[in-house]
């Protein structure tokens, strides 16, 4: 059985968007008193790979000392190999609490937006993956007030929800469950499941507010969700992927890219 110790994994390539995402990792690590592991994988012979890691360490140490960054233990691991392969090997041996990754901005091609590495990690990881677009100014989890949770409501899906709450439990926020009604579906069909989820969450997480929205499908799913999230000031989007369902895997990867591109919203992929 795969181990799951308390640490945060940050796949790292020294880019501006990697550094921006890492600020959230320090915030979370300080809250839970756990370690951050920066994993840098390189394919070519990089003569300056150790120097780059040392420069990054100097930067973080100075930020912590100046009080601009929460104090947290961290370490760098350097691996030669294909990034997604090295990440896969690492998390298979020792599963993290959450993986936090930066993503490129909207000036990139849409297929490159999440990036092949991030998309691959979203697909293979059992741990939640938190993807932060470089255009998003988010330095603390305390800034997250509204989470949009895209759900099929075909199942209470509590396992995926609980994996998110493992690292979001200390914070106060509203989670908005959003379901797009397909042709012929009526909202009343889901009343029992909605009542169950509301009662479960209010009993176990009294500091969390819930809201439910069932939207008739008139546009594409990505556009419907994006319109709702923009109108309701959603800070983070959460979606569930099913490793065993190839349609789900393809759908979530495609939806994730479109939503982050259109709404420039941080994304949590759950399993």
Residues of each region from the PLM?
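Small/aliphatic-rich secondary-structure junction motif
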Residues: 1-51, 145-193, 198-211, 234, ...
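Gly/Ser-rich helix-loop-strand patches that form or flank binding pockets
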Residues: 4, 89-137, 230-271
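CheY-like receiver
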Residues: 28, 86-90, 94, 224, ...
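Short, well-ordered secondary-structure micro-motifs
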Residues: 49, 112, 142, 160, ...
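Short helix-capping segments at alpha-helix termini
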Residues: 65-71, 203-207
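Rossmann-fold cofactor-recognition segment
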Residues: 73-76, 212
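Charged docking surfaces used in two-component/phosphorelay signaling
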Residues: 78-86, 217-222
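A short, acidic, amphipathic alpha-helical segment used as a generic capping/interface helix at domain edges
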Residues: 198, 219-230
